């Protein structure tokens, strides 16, 4: 598995996702990678913190949208732009009482 990407920018995505998980009270964060169809590289970042409210799930990638009192609301929007710049995607796969899972897909 090989991804050609800007290391600093991709690191920023992981920093944003891990920071959000910790702010949500996560005790466990799992990062896994696999090959997808057509040689896509898929990375999933899962945590057991408080779920993202259903009412917010469609808006979390909008710049300056936040559900936190102290949040700026730019972390996930920056992460989405970084993925777009790398011809990839980031999406929220699920967020419920058991787990919140984000998926990064590199094409």
Give the label of every model feature segment:
Residues 10-11:
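A residue-level detector for a conserved hydrophobic packing site
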Residues 47:
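Acidic ATP/Mg2+-coordinating residue in the GHKL
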